C-alpha cells in the first residue's frame, strides 16, 4: 500500500523493505503491484516479471519500461553457463520424447512429443530466463541481434554454448537409448520445399510470440514461459509429422551429429533463421507505441 502524502517541508523516512518485497532475499518471484515511492502517485496494479530480463532499445525507440526496473549485473560467463544448461535440458528432453516413442512403439504419441518440448521450454524460461534470457535457439539469438534487442558481440558466444550443449545432450541420449537414436533425428517426410515452408512458418509464429512477450510493454510478460511453451507445443502438433517441428537449428544439429545422419540438414539451419528474423520483425513493426497516458509495465524479456 502506498504511503500517505507527506506534508510540505516534512522529512520522509522510508521503512526498509520487508522479506516479502520482490528482489530481496526470501521475496516472491512475481508481484502484482508497483508503487512509485518517489512521487507517491496512485498507479493501477501492474504485474512485474523477473524471469526474462531485458535492456536496450528497439529501432531507435527507447523502451521506458526498463528505467525503473534495471536488470541485474550478470557476467557473460554466468549467462553462457545458464544458456548451456538450459539448451542441454531442452535438447535432451525434446529429443528423448520421440526416441521413447520409437522404442516403445508409439507410447508417447504426437501429443506427448509436443508436450516434452513445450514443457521443457516453459520450465527453462522460468528457471534461467532471468540469468541468460533463455534463448536456447541460435535463430532467436540472431533475430534479436538483427533487430537490436541483443548485442551482436555476444552472439558468437551464445551460439557456441547452444551448439555445444546440443551435441553433449545428443551424445548423452545416444548413450542412454542406443540404438534408438534415429527416433530423435528431425528428417522431413515431405518435399524439401514443403519442409522449408513449414519450418519457416512455425518459426515465424514462435518468434512473433516471443517478441511480443519479450519486448512489448503491454504484453503479459509474467506468462512468457507459458506462452512460448504453448507455442512450441502447438507448432509441433502442426508440423511434427512432416518435419519434426524443429524451429531450432541445434534441435536438429545435435542429434544429426550423434547419429551421423545429416539428411536435409540445411533446411533446418536456414528456414528457422529466416522465419525467426521475419517473425520478430513483423511484431516489432506492428506493436503499439508506448502511450504517455498509460504507463508501461516493467517487464523483462529474452534480451540480455
Curated annotation (Swiss-Prot):
The modification Phosphoserine is found at residue 301. Expressed in rosette leaves. InterPro entries: Aquaporin-like, Aquaporin_transptr, MIP, MIP_CS. This is Probable aquaporin NIP5-1. Pfam families: MIP. One of its GO terms (molecular function) is arsenite transmembrane transporter activity. Belongs to the MIP/aquaporin (TC 1.A.8) family. NIP (TC 1.A.8.12) subfamily. The keyword Ion transport does not apply. The lineage of its organism: Eukaryota, Viridiplantae, Streptophyta, Embryophyta, Tracheophyta. A motif (NPA 1) lies at residues 137-139. Boric acid transporter. Low water transport activity. Plays an important role as plasma membrane boric acid channel for the boron uptake required for plant growth and development under boron limitation. Aquaporins contain two tandem repeats each containing three membrane-spanning domains and a pore-forming loop with the signature motif Asn-Pro-Ala/Ser/Val (NPA). Induction: By boron limitation in the root elongation and the root hair zones. The chain crosses the membrane at residues 80-100, 106-126, 157-177, 195-215, 219-239, 266-286. A motif (NPA 2) lies at residues 248-250. Disruption phenotype: Plants display lower boric acid uptake into roots, lower biomass production, and increased sensitivity of root and shoot development to boron deficiency.
Amino acid at each position: 500500500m502506498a504511503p500517505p502524502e507527506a506534508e510540505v517541508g516534512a522529512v520522509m523516512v522510508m521503512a526498509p523493505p520487508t522479506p516479502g518485497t520482490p528482489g530481496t532475499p526470501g521475496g516472491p518471484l512475481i508481484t502484482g503491484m508497483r508503487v512509485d515511492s518517489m512521487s507517491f502517485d496512485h498507479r493501477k496494479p501492474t504485474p512485474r516479471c523477473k524471469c526474462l530480463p531485458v535492456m536496450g532499445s528497439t529501432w531507435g525507440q527507447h523502451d521506458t519500461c526498463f528505467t525503473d526496473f534495471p536488470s541485474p549485473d550478470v557476467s557473460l560467463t554466468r549467462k553462457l553457463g545458464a544458456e548451456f544448461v538450459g539448451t542441454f535440458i531442452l535438447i535432451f528432453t525434446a529429443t528423448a520424447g520421440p526416441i521413447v516413442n520409437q522404442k516403445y512403439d508409439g507410447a508417447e504419441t504426437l501429443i506427448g512429443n509436443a508436450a516434452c518440448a513445450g514443457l521443457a521450454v516453459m520450465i527453462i524460461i522460468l528457471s534461467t530466463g532471468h540469468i541468460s534470457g533463455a534463448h536456447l535457439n541460435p535463430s532467436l539469438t540472431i533475430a534479436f541481434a538483427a533487430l537490436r534487442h541483443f548485442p551482436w558481440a555476444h552472439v558468437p558466444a551464445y551460439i557456441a554454448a547452444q551448439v555445444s550443449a546440443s551435441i553433449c545432450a545428443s551424445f548423452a541420449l545416444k548413450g542412454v537409448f542406443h540404438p534408438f537414436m534415429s527416433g530423435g533425428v528431425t528428417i522431413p517426410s515431405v518435399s524439401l520445399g514443403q519442409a522449408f515452408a513449414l519450418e519457416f512458418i512455425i518459426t515465424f509464429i514462435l518468434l512473433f510470440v516471443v517478441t511480443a512477450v519479450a519486448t512489448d510493454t503491454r504484453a503479459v510478460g509474467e506468462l512468457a514461459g507459458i506462452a512460448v511453451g504453448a507455442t512450441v507445443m502447438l507448432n509441433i502438433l502442426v508440423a511434427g509429422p512432416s518435419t519434426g517441428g524443429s524451429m531450432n537449428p541445434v534441435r536438429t544439429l545435435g542429434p544429426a551429429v550423434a547419429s551421423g545422419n545429416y539428411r536435409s540438414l540445411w533446411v533446418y539451419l536456414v528456414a528457422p533463421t529466416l522465419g525467426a528474423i521475419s517473425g520478430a520483425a513483423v511484431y516489432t513493426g506492428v506493436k503499439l507505441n508506448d502511450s504517455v497516458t498509460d504507463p508501461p509495465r516493467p517487464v523483462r524479456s529474452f534480451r540480455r
